Amino acid sequence: MLKDIQIYELNERIKKKKLKTYNRNKLLKLLTYVERHKICIVLYFNLIKRQLIYIEFVFIRN
């Protein structure tokens, strides 16, 4: 459930194009990877520069 919410939120962010500093195609590819492998990603942003600092993968165990 949490994973789905996070993916949805990320999708919404991409749609709103707030992530101008990060390649949109790369993020979309990442999302498909995440959904296929049932993992959750955590994105860390520098809010001042609106840049993606790094991406952390969190594996979900059922």
From Swiss-Prot:
Main location: plastid
Alphabetical UniProt keywords: Chloroplast, Plastid
Subcellular localization: Plastid, Chloroplast
Listed GO CC annotations: chloroplast
Name the UniProt record assigns to this protein: Uncharacterized 7.8 kDa protein
Annotated source species: Guillardia theta (Cryptophyte)
